[in-house]
Every structure is written in C-alpha cells, then in structure tokens.
C-alpha cells in the first residue's frame, strides 16, 4: 500500500488520505438536494475496499462479491454494517454484476418504478467510483450524444481537430475503463440505438474525421435501463439485443418487502429535506402499500374481492412519493403527524391518471374495500371529501 509522509514523520496510507479528502468534500456538499451514490455512501464504499478479501478486476474499485454486498447490505469482518440499496432477490444482483465482468453489456428491464435507475447508479458507483457517466435517452437523443460531438465554433475555425471534439459520457467511460450508463434506452430512436453495436461488440469507437479510433480500456462496460410498459418506446434490434444480458427487475414479491423499501427511502428523504414532521408510523406506510398492491394485482390481499386495475403502474417509487408528499403536507399544513388526509391527495394523484376510467376504478375501490375495512374509515372519509 502506498504511503505519504507528514511533517511529524508519520506515514498515512494513500487510501486514508483519499477517504479524508472525500469526507471534506461531503461536508461541503451538505446543502445539495441529492448527492450521487458515491458521495452519499462514501463511507460504506471506503470500508468495503478496506475489508476487501477477493480478487479485484482491473480498473474496478472492488471485487464483484463486494459490489453485491454493497447492493444487498451485510456486516463486514470488522463489524461495519453496510446498508441494503436493493431489497429483493440477491441472485438478480449477482447476475447483473457478473455480466459486467464479461464482454456483454447489462440491460435492466422492467416496469416503471422497479429501481432500475437506482440499481444502475449504485452498481456504477461501486465498480467505478463514478456514477455520472450517463446518457439520458429521449426521443430527441441523437448519435452525437452516444458517440461524440463537435464544438461547432472551433470546428468552423479549425476544422475537425482534437480540440473541437466533444467527448460523450460513453467515450469517457471507454477511455477511463469505467461503467457508462444509458437511461431509457428504448426511448431512443432505433437508428440511434444501433450506434451502440460497434461499441459493444468491437469495443471501439471510430472517429473517421480524425482518422483514429477510441479503444475501450479494461473495466469499461455499459448499463442500460428500459421500461417494458410504456408508450412511445422503440424496440431494440435483434443485433443490439444480443449485445446485452437482460436482467428483469420485478416488483417486490411480498408486502413486507415493499413496506421495508418505502420505509427506508422515506427515512432517507426526511433526513435530507429536514421536514418539520414526525417519522410516519409503519401502519400508514403499510396502508399506502396495501392500496397500491391491491389495485395493481386486481384483488384484495385476502383474494376474496376482485378489483379493477387503473391505467397507471402504481409502482413502489410512486408509493414512496405519496408518503413523502404526505410528510410535507403534515409538516407544513398539519400538526406534524401524518394522517389519512395528508396521504389521500397523493394516492389519488397516483391512481387517477385517466380522469374518467381511473376515477371509476377508485370510486369502486372506495365503496367495496375502504368503506368496509376495519380501521380504514379515515381514508374512506378523506377520499370522499377529495372526490
């Protein structure tokens, strides 16, 4: 391990100096609305590297085993506790991380709100120490967002030169041996998507204007995300699909899993936003999650009553937003304690996307389920008032 001398003649490990600098930077970033994963969880990443016991692939920050521990949580040899970032099937995370050791890229696929972007960010943070090499896919994303672009003022003045070249996050990831991220891949036009084929198969990016190419350094790979239930998406070509290993992220299997996810994310949000409201009772979170799961699955939890499902996905991410909104309502326009009336407005906003069909779905749910369920009369009354 490299050391650096101090005036007192002490030798401090380079990793400790790096970690200390990171902590100083984090103190300066306390006013940020949202920190990157590598900033927010810098201590955990540092401890995992310090306790590393497995071989580390070239240009990775830690071993694949440690990356999975970072994602799933666990207790290290020295007793340090790593918090879980993903609550679900561990095998899915092992498959995702193992894919990135190979020459195939990773496609995280699933319904909106199933933590695809969240997992992508944390995998990149753990492997590369940098989750910011990202391309946000939209219908207007062009080839220059994936391959490279030009500073047109310099291009006109100098012609195609290195100084006029504008590097993309993908190009930087190739040169630095890091993980590049592409969000909402299927929102990008099919012709633009296919510019990835050469990058993923040949690991090169030709720049014919400069008569050269960029060759990927070991450690480079791509994580892409895509929704399987969305309007305005472009299917991947069969050639591009072959370059990806697809991992489907499902909705939480059990209500306990989903409640735990919502609770953890709400507590994190409350800490960052410093809301003047008390931590929501677990029962309130459970009620929101129960409503979402029942409407999503088209039946009550006991399976006795069939229900209509609304047009929206009612994902875990939306449940988190509903509780966060309820906290804000309680803190600024209530008594600081979260009540049914604070939650109902958010629930209605998530459920009633179509003002005609979804409204009917919610009204039927109110009258057949909420009205007759013990201890839920407050939500029923608040819903009636809002409707």
PLM segments and residue spans:
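AAA+ P-loop NTPase catalytic core and its hallmark functional loops
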Residues: 26-274
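Non-catalytic, well-ordered alpha-helical scaffold segments
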Residues: 90, 94, 168, 194, ...
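Conserved AAA+ ATPase small/helical "lid" subdomain
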Residues: 266-337
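C-terminal engagement/docking regions of AAA+ P-loop ATPases
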Residues: 331-387
């Amino acid at each position: 391990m490299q050391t650096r001398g101090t005036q007192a003649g002490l030798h401090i490990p380079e990793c400790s100096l790096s970690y200390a600098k990171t902590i100083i930077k984090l103190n300066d970033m306390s006013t940020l609305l949202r920190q990157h994963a590598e900033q927010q969880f810098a201590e955990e990443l540092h401890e995992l590297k310090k306790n590393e016991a497995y071989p580390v692939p070239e240009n990775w920050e830690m071993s694949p085993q440690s990356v999975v521990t970072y994602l799933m949580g666990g207790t290290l040899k020295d007793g340090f506790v790593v918090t879980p970032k993903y609550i679900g099937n561990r095998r899915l995370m092992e498959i995702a991380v193992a894919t990135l050791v190979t020459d195939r890229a990773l496609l995280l696929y699933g319904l909106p709100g199933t933590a695809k972007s969240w997992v992508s960010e944390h995998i990149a943070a753990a492997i590369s120490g940098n989750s910011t090499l990202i391309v946000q896919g939209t219908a207007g994303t062009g080839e220059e967002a994936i391959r490279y672009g030009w500073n047109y003022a310099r291009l006109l003045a100098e012609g195609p030169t290195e100084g006029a070249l504008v590097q993309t996050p993908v190009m930087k990831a190739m040169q630095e041996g890091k993980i590049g991220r592409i969000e909402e891949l299927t929102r990008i036009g099919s012709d633009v998507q296919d510019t990835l084929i050469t990058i993923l198969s040949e690991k090169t990016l030709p720049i014919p204007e400069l008569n050269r190419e960029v060759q990927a350094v070991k450690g480079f790979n791509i994580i892409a995300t895509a929704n399987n239930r969305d309007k305005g998406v472009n299917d991947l070509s069969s050639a591009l699909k072959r370059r990806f290993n697809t991992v489907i992220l499902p909705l939480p299997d059990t209500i306990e899993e989903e409640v735990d996810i919502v609770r953890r994310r709400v507590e994190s949000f409350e800490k960052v936003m410093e809301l003047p409201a008390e931590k929501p009772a677990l029962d309130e979170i459970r009620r929101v999650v129960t409503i979402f799961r029942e409407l999503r699955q088209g039946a009550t939890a006991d399976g006795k009553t069939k229900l209509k499902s609304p047009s929206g996905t009612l994902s875990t991410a939306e449940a988190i937003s509903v509780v966060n909104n309820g906290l804000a309502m309680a803190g600024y326009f209530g008594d600081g304690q979260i009540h049914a009336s604070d939650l109902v407005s958010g629930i209605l906003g998530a459920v009633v996307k179509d003002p005609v069909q979804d409204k009917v779905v919610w009204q039927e749910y109110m009258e057949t389920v909420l009205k007759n369920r013990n201890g839920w009369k407050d939500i029923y009354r608040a819903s009636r008032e809002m409707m």
